[in-house]
Amino acid sequence: MTNQTWSPSKACADFVADLQYADIPAAVIDTMKRDTLDWIGCAVGGAADRSSQPIKAVADVLGGNSQATSIDCARRNVVLAAMSNAYFGHILEMDDVDRDSISHPATPNLAAAFAAAEFAGKQGKDVLLAAVCGFEIMLRIGAAITPAHYKIFHTTATTG
């Protein structure tokens, strides 16, 4: 018999495994759609900025199978597409901010959700569901560990 004690990791995993799109309130979906459009605008601007060149060069050198599309329209393996999109989304420092967690939740969550959804052949509702799950977990963990954590670490990187 296994020990079924509660843990924060198990609670997060259960939340993600159990949440269905139909369970998400309409107001949350509307907010997520708005946040997604905002992030896309930031990422498109970031991809066009000259400071995006290093990540593009790294992604090109690492190569891999063409599995997902980056915001700059390049086809990359799914991990490099997600990494590039996250980088692009944060370049201009105009992405969203959550004050309680001192983080930018859209960048890591939407970058990963879009790349993974394209790779897996999923639809828009799946992207929104994944993003809601990611935001919820990231923001709760971030709020629990800040502000002391933020004195040393960038919360977006450590909780996203």
Q: What residue ranges belong to the model's regions?
A:
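N-terminal core-entry segment
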Residues: T2-G160
